Amino acid sequence: GQLDLAKKHMEMGISLLEQYQLLYTNDSIPQINNYAVLLTEMQEPALALSSLQKLAQIIKEYNSNHCLDYAQVQESLGSICLITANISQAKTHFKKALKIYEDIWADEPELIEEKYKKIQELYPQAGIALAKSILPTKH
């Protein structure tokens, strides 16, 4: 009922963004991210991943693959891969996102640390050892 209606409206919104060539704009990114979350909740993770991969490609094309928007999409891709138990792919996406965060926020270590913690908290189902394996060791 409600989820199907939400999906329909989100698809209409994304279709309009596509029609007017606005998918690359910063405002479309949260919409497509939310759409991917909804699809995952509706047991359609493959469609969610496809939408996010398309968005990542658009961001890369119109901006770069080394900006915060791209990192955010990589983080979302990682989360969905983790939910679907595709651990190695999740790890790849999280590493890409974290590398971008580290470079962009080089002078703001507290933001980087916050991201590491947020991503690490996604891992309890997959095991804490796995989370530690993607995070750099602190000296």
What are these regions (language model features)?
Residues 26-41, 68-79, 113-124:
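Conserved alpha-helical positions within TPR/SEL1-like repeat arrays
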Residues 19-24, 61-66, 103-110:
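Short coil/turn linkers that connect adjacent helices within long alpha-helical scaffolds
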Residues 14-19, 53-61, 98-102:
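Amphipathic alpha-helical segments of tetratricopeptide repeats
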Residues 106-139:
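Terminal, low-structured helical/coil segments at or just beyond the last alpha-helical repeat
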Residues 79, 94-95, 99, 107:
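Long, ordered, amphipathic alpha-helical scaffolds
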Residues 1, 15-16, 23, 30, ...:
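Tandem repeat protein-protein interaction scaffolds
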